[in-house]
């Protein structure tokens, strides 16, 4: 979302008003209504009351947030996590999304994740960590960018086999194996904050300290398959403008 211009954001919000709430909202509400959750990489405009077809922030009982750094490209965090003016602030937890060592088992009823799984070198490891900190049959509301509608449109969706191999080899977040592909195929005309080709290259080489890189690329098919292979039941999949794949799901015991 950070690559959208002001015009694109206004156009997107106008479309939200026209398209209304997502059909999958009915599947999401039982997972989060009046429950305690953890967000990964929040806050997200997509979950706010006036900003999307999936307004869930004001329906939760409580919400904490996990981010890798106190200050990122997208947000600067305090110790408290103010996600809604109508709900008490939660707390910010600073650790890697695939290594939630600061969080005990079964601490939450659900996990929210919006546009950050693509930034992880080992998404299966992350999903399994999210399951660990979630209570039995806990919910997962996952939003991913549809590659065809983003600066990744020249790339191909990453195979689930590849992502499973990353998990089996315990791939670390310092991985740059996708660097040549990204440098060649990234559409900088759709990612103005990335700067020039040289600036983009330098930023990507420093990915461990900024986490801007999209390691993997998703569409409806491989995102659903990835969750299934990771032991997660997919309840609904829905695409929405300008570039979102919403996956409403539940962690299986």
Feature locations, PLM:
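Class I SAM-dependent methyltransferase SAM/SAH-binding core
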Residues: 35-100
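Helix-to-beta-strand junctions that scaffold the AdoMet/dcAdoMet cofactor pocket
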Residues: 120-121, 134-136
């Amino acid at each position: 979302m950070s690559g959208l211009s002001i015009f694109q954001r206004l156009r997107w919000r106008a479309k939200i008003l026209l398209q209304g709430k997502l059909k999958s909202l009915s599947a999401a509400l039982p997972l989060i209504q009046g429950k305690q959750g953890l967000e990964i990489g929040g806050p997200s405009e997509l979950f706010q009351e006036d900003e999307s077809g999936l307004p869930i922030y004001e329906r939760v009982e409580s919400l904490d947030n996990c981010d890798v750094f106190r200050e990122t490209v997208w947000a600067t965090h305090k110790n408290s996590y103010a996600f809604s003016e109508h709900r008490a602030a939660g707390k910010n937890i600073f650790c890697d999304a695939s290594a939630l060592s600061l969080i005990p088992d079964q601490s939450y009823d659900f996990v929210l994740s919006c546009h950050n799984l693509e930034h992880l070198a080992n998404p299966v490891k992350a999903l399994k960590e999210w399951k660990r900190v979630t209570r039995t049959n806990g919910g997962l509301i996952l939003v991913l960018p549809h590659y065809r509608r983003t600066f990744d449109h020249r790339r191909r969706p990453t195979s689930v086999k590849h992502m499973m191999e990353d998990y089996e080899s315990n791939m670390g977040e310092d991985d740059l194996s996708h660097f040549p592909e990204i440098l060649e195929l990234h559409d900088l005309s759709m990612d103005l904050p990335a700067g020039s080709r040289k600036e983009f290259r330098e930023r990507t080489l420093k990915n461990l300290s900024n986490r801007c890189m999209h390691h993997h690329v998703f569409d409806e098919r491989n995102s659903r398959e990835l969750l299934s292979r990771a032991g997660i039941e997919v309840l609904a999949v829905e695409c929405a403008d300008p570039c979102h794949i919403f996956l409403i799901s539940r962690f299986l015991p």
